[in-house]
Amino acid sequence: MIDKLGDFKRDYFCGELTENNIGDEVRLLGWADSVRDHGGVIFINLRDKEGIIQVVIDPSKSPKEAYEKAKKVRSEYVLAVRGRVQRRPAGTENPKLPTGTIEIAVDELRILNTCDILPFPIEDGISAHEEVRLRYRFLDIRRPEMMKKLILRHEVYQATREYLAGHGFLEVETPMLTKSTPEGARDFLVPARLEKGKFYALPQSPQLFKQILMVSGIDRYFQIVKCFRDEDLRKDRQPEFTQIDFEMSFVDEEDVITVSEGLIHYIFKKVLGIELKLPFKRMSYTEAIERYGTDKPDLRYSLELKDITDIAKDVQFKVFKDTVEKGGIVKGINVKGGSKFSRKEIDDLTEEAKKYGAKGMAWIKINEDGSLQSPIVKFFTEEQINKIKEIMEGENGDLLIFIADSYEITHRVLGFLRKHLAEKLKLIPENVWEFVWVVDFPLVEWDEEEGRLVALHHPFTSPKEEDIDRLDEAIQDKKVALSFRSRAYDLVLNGEEIGGGSIRIHSSHIQKKVFELLGISDEEAEEKFGFLINALKYGAPPHGGLAFGLDRIVALMTGSESIRDVIAFPKTQKGICPLTDAPDFVQEDQLEELGIEVNIPEETV
């Protein structure tokens, strides 16, 4: 028999009660986290979003009706409890619970709902498959660790709004149904019923609208906004994700960076109680690539890349010598204490290198007694070995590993190996927050597949001022274009990009030239971006901004392995929602109304 809630009102959340409440009569609502019968006395751990408290139904003290109902309670039954807060008997305290020194002596118990057999226990550290957790997400979220993550996410929202509103930003919404302007990832398309054959697109970002808001005189805009990208998914990707997006007029890079650092500092202080040191570190894109093998460097550990190209060009080891003669480079990493690696471990490391594009991996062990062990050491003079050891800071007990290839492949492979080694050797400290701004990015890069230059960030990023006057030259010579640097900046935290932005192009004339540089014709530019180009003609102020990946920030703040763990209802890596079975087929009459025919290749049916 299910009881009615009626006029029963909660006084406290379970986790809010303390010893100061001893003697108080309280009313609580929640779920039965666990039920135990000890010699006829029934103990129920009652749970809500704030925590757990023990309630006691003693047949010698509680009303008979309450006791009879308590005997029927099972895990995850929904309960209303009225009783008095009392101190737990000495020796029965539970130090694992914040409420572990008190309990509720029950005077009234209502069973508001029952619960079917659970697919997994409602507790932290479960081993249930992720797809099962997502199918029963309403149960998964009840688990304390999931609840805490969503509460923290809410607190990040609140802190963001407090900080930005306090610094003169206006929260302005931009459209969810907009024009398809595919640059990079695919758009999610929405058919327009009233304009058959035409489609809206869900926005990949509010980029163009926030620039137009600057033209509109808003001056400082922000939004916590959903964005959509139809791309292949990884652990840090979702088809729909949330950005903290802002834009400012009459600013340069320093202004945007100052606001960004202030916001992150405020969020960490308000939500985690952590005082971050400002300003954050900075390094150029080139420095990041050449020291760490990536434009998202993790500064929590060393393992820096060292360049031995000047030595390699003169050695007898053919792989090194030939690579340098062909314009390549030779770089390495000193794995401190790595001489203890077995040959199998080194072979495994070589296979890791090959996964990321290396043809092989050379290595030299410096044994504890100073002797060298390596199949390549015979090709080096003693002077060359000593010089390599000096550059690599090699000492007894170290393992030196080398990659010889093109500039791009060498850095990419060593960047991945650096991360792999840090994880293998447990070099990554916990509870350390290493922020770094990466600046001075190339404006463009060459895309082999498309056979044209593409924007490294997006086509609305301004070149450095010294490069603007050379745009005509760059349009004629891609080598000149590849030397251009942009006014872009990315913020990296512990090896993860958490935000990126730039100073934008605010001149329609320069914007058209950048489109031309990227191989976008006047007709294509007008078709895709005509509304922006037109707006830039009407007194657009200099402006810039940034977008933070909110999901990624919350994942890092909570120590989550995937952003799926900090999103209430995420998609799987295949873009499926197991809870609702979306995406799904729709009815034929819905398609007819839209004027759409679906052609599904046979192999996908």
From Swiss-Prot:
Where does this protein hold ATP? 229-231, 238, 497, 549-552
Which Gene3D superfamilies did the record assign? Bira Bifunctional Protein, Domain 2, GAD-like domain, Nucleic acid-binding proteins
Stretch list, region Aspartate = 207-210
Q: Which InterPro entries match?
A: Aa-tRNA-synt_II (IPR004364), aa-tRNA-synth_II (IPR006195), aa-tRNA-synth_II/BPL/LPL (IPR045864), Asp-tRNA-ligase_1 (IPR004524), Asp-tRNA-ligase_1_N (IPR047089), Asp/Asn-tRNA-synth_IIb (IPR002312), AspRS_core (IPR047090), GAD-like_sf (IPR004115)
- Main subcellular location of this protein, as a coarse class: cytoplasm
The UniProt keywords, alphabetically, are:
Aminoacyl-tRNA synthetase, ATP-binding, Cytoplasm, Ligase, Nucleotide-binding, Protein biosynthesis
Q: Where is this site: Important for tRNA non-discrimination?
A: 38, 91
Presence of the UniProt keyword rRNA processing in the record: no
Its recorded reaction(s) are: tRNA(Asx) + L-aspartate + ATP = L-aspartyl-tRNA(Asx) + AMP + diphosphate
Pfam families, from UniProt?
GAD, tRNA-synt_2, tRNA_anti-codon
A single Gene Ontology biological process assigned to it is:
aspartyl-tRNA aminoacylation
Subcellular location per the Swiss-Prot or TrEMBL entry: Cytoplasm
What's any one GO cellular component for it? cytoplasm
Report which superkingdom the organism of origin falls in.
Bacteria
Any idea which positions bind L-aspartate?
183, 229, 457, 504
Q: What does this protein do?
A: Aspartyl-tRNA synthetase with relaxed tRNA specificity since it is able to aspartylate not only its cognate tRNA(Asp) but also tRNA(Asn). Reaction proceeds in two steps: L-aspartate is first activated by ATP to form Asp-AMP and then transferred to the acceptor end of tRNA(Asp/Asn).
This chain's protein is named: Aspartate--tRNA(Asp/Asn) ligase
Q: Which organism is it from?
A: Persephonella marina (strain DSM 14350 / EX-H1)
